[in-house]
Curated annotation (Swiss-Prot):
GO terms for cellular component: cell envelope Sec protein transport complex; cytosol; plasma membrane. It comes from Shewanella amazonensis (strain ATCC BAA-1098 / SB2B). Monomer and homodimer. Part of the essential Sec protein translocation apparatus which comprises SecA, SecYEG and auxiliary proteins SecDF-YajC and YidC. It holds the Pfam family SecA_PP_bind. The keyword Plastid does not apply. PROSITE patterns: SECA (PS01312), SECA_MOTOR_DEAD (PS51196). Belongs to the SecA family. It catalyses: ATP + H2O + cellular proteinSide 1 = ADP + phosphate + cellular proteinSide 2. This is Protein translocase subunit SecA. SMART domains: SecA_DEAD, SecA_PP_bind.
Length: 908
């Protein structure tokens, strides 16, 4: 109450921010008259002037007002569109490492031109990131004339480009592209073997459109580049046949309750658990199928792989539904994005889940994958020097943006007041009654000529609704993952009088629904439209537009509440753009997933108190509040999962940064001769110490073992015993020095034989190839460690601390193995000439081409093993924003406490 009083007196933090931005808007508006008088050439010359002033030491902040005034004036001349004051405010928010919440239809695409131009003046590149290829191409082409007028180049980064085209896209001043492509390019660059193979410049400024979709919805999903592993498709098929024999029970076994079923499903945690009875039944079925030895246990160490197959098959059958989580297209299982309803071709679930779903659907089972490189969007975007984003719905997730990314959210006011009517939810007892009410509402709207957009949460639901509409002979368009090629076209005309559009979730986001239909798309459909054609189409549209406004604007119908309030707000936000009229209502039933899993008891009790009967709907603020509380619970749980994932991935991220930094230094170095000499001395000294312990008596020495090891691993035939027999005064220190010197002489002889340039190139190739192989094995080891780490909680240990400790030990082992393997290869391999190095490089490229790389998203829940347990066991540690380059004198990111140059920076 006291806080509300202070807010009324001083205004909210958002109000105070807008007040500050308003002062800069006044400055920009004051420049407008002066800039209108400039010729085109004088306006274009402003870009060179700004760049020169930056070089002399002025900051972007000092240039902002003039740069924004320049873009506004250029936009008036090129597009005949003038940036509103609220768009200038949005541009300022985006330039200051913040998130701008701007409502649908407020011109986010045009707003983005302001900070994109300003930050491109530095010459370091600007990345404008969208959710799909269509929007990236559309926005780039739409804004290209404006940027080119101002002397800025524009690139588009989408999948399928050649290396040269990608390089050109990244070298442009402003690059549009998708989040996936930018992330994968980063991983590919860090797998390159030559500096020329890299495409990205250092990551400077990212401006993310639909930032909530990318930084929140996709945050649990790591990007993975993987190669094919061993083929086990037959095993997936055989295990798949056993699952239909298992029976589900309603709840998990406890001390008080032991059920009759074989497994139970925890819908909240999206997990499936086998009962003891189920384990015995599965073991019996596996024995009968010849997959498990008589009397053997599924849980013995030798059968871990088989247990993995059983778990994957059980999850595929119980948790993943066709036309909800995936569709089958062209004999392939294609994942459906739960947040947008779009299909994601080329993406695959990890840990054998995708293969289990393929076996369930009877399509061709593709090989399992082995991770070659991976990163989460959370960690990729934190690598940028500057980060900003815009969306129509960010305020509900403001805490997460601040906590994870250090980004404040500013709600930018609309240009015209919002007049959409958001009506309370209607709740029915059954789904059948709910759909009857939805059909009745649609009929009512059609009679009045009011367009309707119906939002569903799955393809299955949209197809059910489509069948019901067909039964009632109501013409409509369906927009879901199966037909998204027609997406923009359908969305463009969804505002016509009486139009009914059924959209899965928020497919079609990014395209405005214009009341009366989109007249521009009608003009584009004509080959050579004349002035008369354009005037006629505009006049027809004016009549249609006014009729739709008269009917009440676009009516939004939600068939179910989403887990997140933000997704519901996105659906509502399609109506009421730029002061247009509109309305929205959600229809719910007690059989909906959210109600059934999270809100059923409380709402059911309310319904009983209110005396509800079949066919009746309840419309009460209590119910709406109860549903929103249920959504808050789910949002908080999902935030916890994302936070836990980030804390675990931060451990891998620190190691990733060390490895990638070393890799890039090795690749950019002219020669790594000094590095090889340093690690050679370490390795040989370490090997000697195993057989001749430091400061030990001669009786403890294992000289034959040392001679044998040096010969087998390093190709060094040294008469160590002979030296000791002949020289009584040969001490341990002197012996060490002699062995190291002899190795160096042998290596120098090899250098003289093949030539210095050839050997230097060979050293680099061996170092990079060995590092890549060991890093790949290390990622697999980290995956295995993470999957079982939550069990440490039962031993009263903190899983997070244990993970940090063990992953650090694994990393240390990897670096020691790297040193040893590199020296062993360089010592033993006989390089005759340049052709040998070329042959090695050719073999590497052939191997690279043979490994069919998959670009995939690991399935979210599997990434943290059992997130619900993990969230309870792990302590909540604040996440620190990172991504800075590690200096040689900085503390090493691995957590050892040493300086980087004395720890993991040693290699470079």
């Amino acid at each position: 109450m006291f806080g509300n009083l202070l807010t009324k007196i001083f205004g909210s933090r958002n109000d105070r921010t807008l007040k500050q931005l308003g002062k800069v808007v006044v400055k920009i508006n004051a420049l407008e008259a002066e800039y209108e008088k400039l010729s085109d050439e004088e306006l274009k010359a402003k870009t060179a002037e700004f760049k020169a002033r930056l070089e002399k030491g002025e900051s972007l902040n000092e240039l902002m007002a003039e740069a924004f005034a320049t873009v506004r004036e250029a936009s008036k001349r090129v597009f005949e569109m003038r940036h509103f004051d609220v768009q200038l405010m949005g541009g300022m928010v985006l330039d200051s490492n913040r998130i701008a919440e701007m409502r649908t239809g407020e011109g986010k695409t045009l707003t983005a031109t302001l900070p994109a131009y300003l930050n491109a003046l530095t010459g370091k590149g600007v990345h404008v990131i969208t959710v799909n290829d269509y929007l990236a191409r559309r926005d780039a082409e739409n804004n290209r004339p404006l940027f080119e007028f101002l002397g800025m180049s524009v690139g588009v980064n989408v999948a399928g480009l050649s290396h040269a085209d990608k390089k050109a896209a990244y070298d442009a001043d402003i690059t549009y592209g998708t989040n996936n492509e930018f992330g994968f390019d980063y991983l590919r660059d860090n797998m390159a073997f030559s500096p020329n193979d890299r495409v990205q410049r250092p990551l400077h400024y990212a401006l993310i459109d639909e930032v909530d979709s990318i930084l929140i919805d996709e945050a649990r999903t790591p990007l993975i580049i993987s190669g094919a592993a061993e083929d086990s498709s037959e095993l997936y098929m055989r295990v798949n046949k056993l699952i239909p024999s298992l029976i589900r029970q309603e709840k998990e076994d406890t001390e008080e309750f032991v059920g009759e079923g074989d497994y139970s499903i925890d819908e909240k945690a999206r997990q499936v658990h086998m009962t003891e009875r189920g384990q015995e039944k599965v073991e019996q079925l596996l024995t009968e199928a010849g997959l498990l030895a008589e009397g053997d246990s599924l849980y013995s160490a030798a059968n871990i792989s088989l247990l993995h197959h059983v778990n994957a098959a059980l999850r595929a059958h119980t948790l993943f539904e066709k036309d909800v989580d995936y569709v089958v297209q062209n004999n392939e299982v294609v994942i459906v994005d739960e947040h947008t309803g779009r299909t994601m071709p080329g993406r695959r679930w990890s840990e054998g889940l995708h293969q289990a779903v393929e076996a369930k659907e009877g399509v061709r089972i593709q090989n399992e994958n082995q991770t070659l490189a991976s990163i989460t969007f959370q960690n990729y975007f934190r690598l940028y020097e500057k980060l900003a984003g815009m969306t129509g719905t960010a305020d509900t997730e403001a805490f997460e943006f601040q906590h994870i990314y250090g980004l404040d959210t500013v709600v930018v006011p609309t240009n015209r007041p919002m007049v959409r009517k958001d009506m309370p939810d209607l709740v029915y007892l059954t789904a059948r009654e709910k759909y009857q009410a939805i059909i009745a509402d649609i009929k009512d709207c059609r009679e009045r000529g009011q367009p309707v957009l119906v939002g569903t949460v799955s393809i299955e639901q949209s197809e059910l609704l489509s069948r019901l509409l067909n039964q009632d002979k109501i013409p409509h368009q369906v927009l879901n993952a199966k037909f998204h090629e027609k997406e923009a076209e359908i969305v463009a005309q969804a505002g016509r009088s009486g139009a009914v559009t059924v959209a899965t979730n928020m497919a079609g986001r990014g395209t405005d629904i214009v009341l009366g239909g989109n007249w521009k798309s009608e003009i584009e459909a004509l080959e050579n439209p004349s002035e008369a054609d354009i005037a006629r189409i505009r006049a027809d549209w004016e009549v249609r537009h006014n009729a739709v406004v008269e009917a009440g604007g676009l009516h939004i119908l939600g068939t179910e509440r989403h887990e997140s309030r933000r997704i519901d707000n996105q659906l509502r936000g399609r109506s009421g753009r730029q002061g247009d009229p509109g309305s929205s209502r959600f229809y719910l039933s007690m059989e909906d997933n959210l109600m059934r899993i999270f809100a059923s008891e409380r709402v059911a009790n309310m319904m009983k108190k209110l005396g509800m009967e079949e066919g009746e709907a309840i419309e009460h603020p209590w119910v709406t509040r109860a549903i929103e509380n249920a959504q808050r619970k789910v949002e908080a749980r999902n935030f916890d999962i994302r936070k836990q994932l980030l804390e675990f991935d931060d451990v891998a991220n620190d190691q990733r940064q060390v490895v990638y930094a070393q890799r890039n230094e090795l690749m950019d170095a002219e020669s790594i001769e000094e590095t090889i000499k340093n690690i050679q001395a370490d390795v040989v000294d370490g090997v000697i110490s195993q057989y001749i312990p430091p400061q030990s008596v001669e009786e403890l020495w294992d000289v034959p073992g040392l001679e044998d090891r040096l010969a087998k691993e390093f190709g060094l035939q040294l008469p160590v015993q002979e030296w000791l027999d002949k020289e009584d005064d040969l001490h341990e220190e002197t012996l060490r020095e002699r062995i190291v010197d002899t190795w160096r002489q042998a290596y120098e002889a090899k250098e003289q034989m093949v030539g210095t340039p050839v050997l230097r190139q060979f050293e680099k190739a061996v170092m990079l190839q060995t590092l890549d192989g060991l890093w790949k094995e290390h990622l697999a080891a980290m995956d295995h460690l993470r999957q079982g780490i939550h069990l440490r909680g039962y031993a009263q240990k903190n899983p997070k601390q244990e993970y940090k400790r063990e992953s650090f030990e694994l990393f240390q082992q990897m670096l020691e193995t790297l040193k040893h393997d590199v020296i062993a290869i360089l010592s033993k391999v006989q390089v005759q000439a340049q052709s040998d190095v070329d042959e090695m490089e050719a073999r590497r490229r052939e191997e690279e081409a043979r490994i069919q790389r998959e670009y995939q998203h690991a399935e979210a829940e599997s990434m943290a093993s059992d997130n619900s347990e993990l969230a309870d066991m792990a302590s909540h540690v604040p996440v620190v924003r990172d991504g800075e380059k590690v200096g040689r004198n900085d503390p090493c990111p691995c957590g050892s406490g040493k300086k980087y140059k004395q720890c993991h920076g040693k290699l470079t």
